Amino acid sequence: MKKCFYILFLFLSMPLWAQAQTRRASIPLQHGAHRIGNRTDADMERWRQHGLGQFIHWGVYAIPGGFWEGKCYPGAAEWIRSWKEMPKDAYDSLYKQFNPTSFDAKAWAKQARQMGANYMIFTTKHHDGFCLWPSKYTDYTIAHTPYKKDVVKQIVDAYTAEGIDVHLYFSIIDWNHKGYRPAPPETRQDSIAYETFKEFTRNQLIELLTDYPAIKGLWFDGSWDKA
């Protein structure tokens, strides 16, 4: 198959940080900053001194690359599933073609070091919900593609070996999860479904923090969503 890489570099970005919490009966939503004022801790000071960084978006959306049935759609390619012209079932089947056999995380990391990057942020999953690590909480992952290998682990290991701090991007929107709601739940059924999504999200975050202990932080996306 034709292999595509959709790589976006974003410099001097600010991440949001997260820590795994112990078990709890319910998971109340909390939005906004958890601290008041400027942080002065060592981790934040290290971040402020990083300067140049690398932000990589990669997923099954690299296969259409912004094109569908011969038409080019302007805008970010990772949003193509939300466009009316592309059937969702067609997009959700793209993972069956995802087989980047030429992917070389060590080469990426080496090039990043050569260009002077001190940190990188990598998409573990975007809004489509496809996971580039073999999450045990969903089948919509790299493990069920022809490629099968854990992309996140390769990235974390390669960049860490080059002395580059790794932060993991995580979308709090997940179009693939049945419990996700784009707006506040209006019915009891919606509330129950959304509670399963919150638990799913928490489990995946703990999974990432547990399986990739070398990472320096998490970058959350999707906080504009009304849910």
Each model region followed by its residue ranges:
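Mature catalytic domains of secreted/periplasmic carbohydrate-active enzymes
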Residues: 21-227
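Bacterial Sec-dependent N-terminal signal peptides
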Residues: 1-25
